[in-house]
């Protein structure tokens, strides 16, 4: 009886893995991957010149890497 149970379990595992292989497994939506891959760290934004470091001139919070503009200069925090 134990051998039959083990044999049935092995058969079920083999069938499920075969179904995953044929079906391509779990497919994640590409839009979600693209969205997450577009995010950059603060250092990457600064290195590529997309934001300004502290003590640089700014007009809006988005100008600063810290997202903290006092109206004239970027603040550190």
UniProtKB/Swiss-Prot annotation:
Q: Which cysteines are joined by disulfide bonds?
A: 51-65, 58-69, 64-74
* GO terms under cellular component: extracellular region
Segments crossing the lipid bilayer: none
Signal peptide, first to last residue: 1-19
Presence of the UniProt keyword rRNA-binding in the record: no
Look up keyword Translocase and say if it applies. Answer: no
What's a Gene Ontology MF term here? toxin activity
Q: Keyword set for this entry?
A: Cleavage on pair of basic residues, Disulfide bond, Knottin, Neurotoxin, Secreted, Signal, Toxin
Location in or out of the cell: Secreted
Expressing tissues = Expressed by the venom duct.
Which stretches of the sequence are propeptide? Answer: 20-37
Task: Give the domain of life.
Answer: Eukaryota
Question: Family assignment?
Answer: Belongs to the conotoxin O2 superfamily.
* Domain text: The presence of a 'disulfide through disulfide knot' structurally defines this protein as a knottin.
Q: What's the name of the protein?
A: Conotoxin VnMEKL-023
Q: Give the species.
A: Conus ventricosus (Mediterranean cone)
């Amino acid at each position: 009886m134990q051998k039959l149970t083990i044999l049935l379990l092995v058969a079920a595992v083999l069938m499920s893995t075969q179904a995953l292989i044929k079906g391509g497994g779990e497919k994640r939506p590409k839009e979600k991957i693209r969205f997450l891959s577009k995010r950059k760290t603060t250092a990457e934004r600064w290195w590529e010149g997309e934001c300004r470091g502290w003590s640089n001139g700014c007009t809006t919070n988005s100008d600063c890497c810290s997202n903290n503009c006092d109206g004239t200069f970027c603040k550190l925090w």
